[in-house]
């Protein structure tokens, strides 16, 4: 008998997604259609009703936040068993696999994962040593090209870029370092060159769930495909109408490719929206239907709503747009009973926030900017991490050069050399 408390609030399509356990499943989940609840309920169902061991389940998420949220919600449902379910971002999963198997690729298991700031410093050293003109090829442009090449968004590097790439990879290997793209590329290489290692992880992860498939790039998709080849118990969830990470190499085509790679896959669509009103959804459906690469679907809601739910205001200049939004906020707060924290302003890129900030300061509108600067990217935090890494391994010259003048000690370039 099923203990169905966690299933009773699911709609028919969600329930089908939860109970279809064996074989490949592709779920097209529109915005606000209960995707996360369906994923959680499916894992609970697998453990409670199908007696699948939690350590045979791998759930791949796109962000650390999603990973933490999934684990917290699972703990409420299955308590201690939740800690045995593998829940991880693809980068974290690959890092753990490489820590255990790095020697097969001639890396040490204590390899260091570097970020973009470290990459710039390393390229600066390479440029200086090889007398490369940064006006011809800036380090940041080189980093982007190298990343695109590694995640297969770029097929070939030529000329100066190829030279820089080769020297960069040599430096990383000699210093036992990997960048974020290496975590993926080297895991894929490890699996292709060592079938026994691949089979070990295939046997460990017999049931694989993938969240936000539309945000995966080519290498990520290929790794997932290798892992699920033996048992084909792959459950992929995504929304082809919500792909926003193409600048990071994400391929919305992966959702369509899934159907080609798994021709027997069951296709399920979650289309009942629990967030918005039907009026808002009609507006969004009218816009989204023009997308060329998508699975046909139309979201609906049992909340009817009114015509005032959607307002379109055309502005010819950004000053007019900012003025209109500022006035709307003041009207909502002063005359309609809203609070400032009830309101969100969403813009296309970070550079546009400056115009709104100036207007909000002038009108004394309190605001917070979200996602502008990560804690670990702050200079002072990076400095402390470099101190700790250099203490742990004095051979790491990159970290030594960062901290030698923090605080200022008046040590010049010639002295450092």
Where are these regions (language model features)?
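Short alpha-helix plus adjacent loop in nuclease-associated cores
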Residues: 93-101, 241-248, 275-276, 371-392, ...
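Conserved helicase motor core of SF1/SF2 NTP-dependent helicases
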Residues: 33, 210, 214-290, 300-304
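Helicase P-loop NTPase motor core
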Residues: 27, 33-39, 263-266, 271-366, ...
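N-terminal pre-P-loop "Q-motif" helix
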Residues: 6-22, 219
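Motif I (Walker A/P-loop) of helicase-class P-loop NTPases
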Residues: 36-45, 70-71, 220, 325
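A short beta-strand-to-loop transition that corresponds to the Sensor-1 phosphate-sensing loop
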Residues: 43, 61-65, 89-92, 238-241, ...
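A basic/glycine-biased coupling hinge at the interface between accessory DNA-binding modules
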Residues: 3-4, 22-25, 30-33, 44-207, ...
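Conserved helicase C-terminal RecA-like lobe
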Residues: 353-359, 365, 378, 385-417
């Amino acid at each position: 008998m099923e203990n169905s408390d966690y299933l009773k609030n699911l709609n028919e399509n969600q329930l089908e997604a939860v109970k279809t356990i064996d074989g490949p499943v592709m779920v097209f989940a529109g915005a606000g259609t209960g995707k996360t609840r369906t994923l959680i309920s499916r894992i609970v169902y697998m453990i409670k009703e199908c007696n699948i061991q939690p350590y045979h389940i791998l759930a791949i998420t796109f962000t650390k936040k999603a990973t933490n949220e999934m684990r917290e919600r699972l703990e409420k449902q299955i308590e201690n068993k939740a800690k045995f379910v593998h829940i991880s971002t693809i980068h974290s999963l690959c890092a753990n696999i490489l820590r255990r198997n790095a020697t097969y690729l001639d890396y040490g298991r204590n390899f260091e994962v570097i970020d973009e700031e470290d990459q710039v410093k390393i390229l600066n050293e390479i440029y200086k040593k090889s007398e490369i003109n940064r006006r011809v090829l800036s380090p940041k442009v080189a980093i982007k090209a190298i990343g695109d090449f590694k995640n297969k968004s770029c097929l070939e590097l030529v000329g100066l870029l190829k030279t820089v790439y080769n020297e960069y990879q040599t430096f990383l290997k000699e210093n036992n370092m990997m960048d974020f793209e290496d975590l993926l590329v080297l895991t894929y290489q490890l699996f292709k060159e060592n079938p026994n290692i691949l089979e070990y992880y295939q046997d460990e992860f017999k049931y694989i769930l993938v969240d936000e498939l539309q945000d995966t790039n080519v290498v990520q998709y290929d790794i997932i495909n290798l892992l699920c080849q033996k048992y084909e118990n792959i459950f992929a969830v995504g929304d082809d109408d919500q792909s926003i990470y193409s600048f990071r190499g994400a391929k919305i085509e992966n959702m369509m490719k899934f159907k080609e790679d798994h021709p027997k896959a069951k296709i399920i669509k979650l289309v009942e929206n629990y967030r918005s009103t039907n009026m808002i959804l009609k507006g969004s459906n009218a816009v989204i239907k023009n997308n060329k690469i998508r699975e046909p679907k139309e979201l609906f809601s049992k909340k009817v709503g009114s015509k005032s739910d959607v307002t379109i205001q055309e502005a010819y200049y950004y000053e007019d747009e900012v003025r209109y939004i500022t006035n709307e906020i003041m009207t909502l707060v002063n005359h309609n009973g809203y609070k400032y924290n009830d309101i969100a302003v969403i813009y296309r890129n970070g550079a546009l926030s400056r115009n709104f900030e100036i207007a909000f300061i002038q009108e004394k509108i309190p605001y917070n900017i979200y996602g502008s600067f990560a804690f670990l990217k702050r200079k002072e935090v990076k400095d402390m991490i470099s101190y700790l890494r250099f203490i742990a391994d004095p051979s790491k010259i990159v970290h030594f050069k960062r901290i030698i003048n923090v605080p200022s000690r008046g040590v010049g370039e010639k002295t450092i050399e």
